[in-house]
Amino acid sequence: MGIKTPTVHQDQTPVHLRANRGAVSRWLGRTVLSILGWRVEGQIPDLKRLLVIGAPHTSNWDFVLAMATILGLNLRMRWLAKHTIFKRGVVWFMEWLGGIPTDRTQPQAIVESVARLARKGKGVVIGITPEGTRKKALKWKTGFLRLARALDCPILMVAINFPTKTIVIGDLYHPSGDNNYDLVAIKQYYDQFQGIHKDQF
């Protein structure tokens, strides 16, 4: 019997971007991915600041896969999500996972909050879904581009690819300053991937 390839490992994360989670948390992430039949490909770049975007976002399962990936990578990442999902009783768990509740009616406040995070510590990784919804989005929101400028960092494009059951840590994208151009270029990159519900992307 051959040695089974790990689904994900903290060696895929630079030391300075690793969280202080214990071995049990990393085991949980690996186990969830293994049970579901998924694996993580690629390396987190060795940079001080990163804005991570994840797509295609077509299913509630995306959240489970994302959290398992973060735990398995032992990645110290803060991720932005609608404040409405931070329900009483689970807020502590969501925040332990790195969640930051955001009110999308106040985009400037979000940018300022993220910029403050970037000024702290030895490195920061912020995650966001550019589509903003699981439903088919004809036009992506540009907030993540503003966040990248506020952080003064490149965008790491991470993809869910259902046909191969792979989480792909993909290319770095450096925003040009032209939001329309950047959205087209980034969406074209994601055209090669297929979400769990392909008709929603």
Describe each region flagged by the PLM.
Residues G2-N20, V24, I35, P107-F201:
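Non-catalytic C-terminal accessory region of glycerolipid acyltransferases
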Residues R18-R30, M94-Q106:
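Acidic/glycine-enriched edge-of-secondary-structure segments
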Residues R21-H57:
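Helix-to-loop junction immediately C-terminal to a conserved catalytic motif
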Residues W27-L28, L65, G89, T142-G143:
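Short Gly/charged-rich anion-binding patches and loops
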Residues T31, A68, W92, R116, ...:
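Surface-exposed charge patches
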Residues S34-I35, G72, W96, A150:
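Residues at alpha-helix termini
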Residues Q43-T105, F162, D171:
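Catalytic core of membrane glycerolipid acyltransferases/transacylases, capturing the structured
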